[in-house]
Amino acid sequence: MTAHDPAAVFDPAAYARGVPHALFRELRETSPVCRVPEPAVGPWPAGPGYWAVFRHADVKHVLRTPGLFSSHLGATQIRDPDTPGDLDFVRAMMLNQDPPAHARQRRIVAAAFTPRAVRELEAVVEARAHALVGAVARQGAADFVELAADLPVWTLAQVMGVPEQDRRLLVDWSNRVIGYQDPEHAASHTADPAELTPMGRAALAERPASPVRADGTPLNPRSREALADMFAYAHALADRPRPGSVMARMREGGLSRAEFENMFFLFAVAGNETLRNGVPGALLTLLDHPGQYEALRRRPELTASAVEETLRHWPPVMNFRRTATRDTELGGRHVRRGEKVVVYHVSANRDERVFDDPDRFDITRTPNDHLSFGFGPHFCLGAHLARTQTRAMLRAAVDRLPGLERAGEPVRLTSNFQNGLTHLPVRWRTDR
């Protein structure tokens, strides 16, 4: 694999060293739609390869044309589900639906994520962020990944009605699903059974003893088999939902069993992990641009636009897959029916055709047509809540940790999907 080989955009290890922005820049110019192979990665088998899409306009075209580029046919992850049964199961997820089925599921829970609903949460989210930062302010140092991880888990628990004692289960499920390519997260077991509710302990007993089957093949981390404990918990929680919570809406929404389980999966994992990756990434980006950090410190009114620019610069999710429903042309290439098409938001967000000086980090940038929350019918349902949490955590850190700076090298998540950090050591002055 050479420095200019498109195959590098699939290699999870490449992202552990940093997003290959120089390669994306070259591919936008020379091969804006190109074939990328899928070699075996560790115990995971090779795949048939896919069409990678790098330019902003082409990414938008794919995302807004579900009749041509389906989320349902092969689901939305690069890697194919292991079996036809696994594919049938994950197809029930809202994320993996095409219109009109997608809209039916989205309507069931959409009211919990409207701007008005999120505004009602804003004060408690901000208070929680300041409490988290205040609890460590006198220490002078922390791992910001660990510090910031509590806010999305806490917020998700509030929205879903998950008891405080069971919040660590959400962390473990996210780690196992999103971080399966990273040895630090692949077998996450941070929940202490002694601290869980009886409902949580009963669910934990359903967790597979090993991420590997008896025949030596790995469990698909997104399968019903691998997540038996999560789905057991989902059903138990639905039997006692807090009125008005997302769980109550799901229970009353007429979902099938598979739809219900997959919707719980979507909120418990995507609603958690995206922020766990995005908030530390946003802070790291600011720390690496001291002038912009200082501007944000002095001018709180720039917080909203700063969040948009950190999202553009550090999209928490780097790509999503679609499957061609018929033969078509895309970026001058012939795509056949049934072939995978993977759009790279992380590349589109730096497309020179859309963004002036795209590698420049500028918290006053306007307009800022980034695609970090997607586009079209699958635009992120939780975008308003994600923005609120990111603003709250960044503002708390900037305002309450004087002289905030790196205290060592960050450690990146090994993943070709999530743009994450596993560690971000920081320090600050404790002179006030």
Question: What is the predicted function of each stretch?
Answer:
Residues 1-432:
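Cytochrome P450
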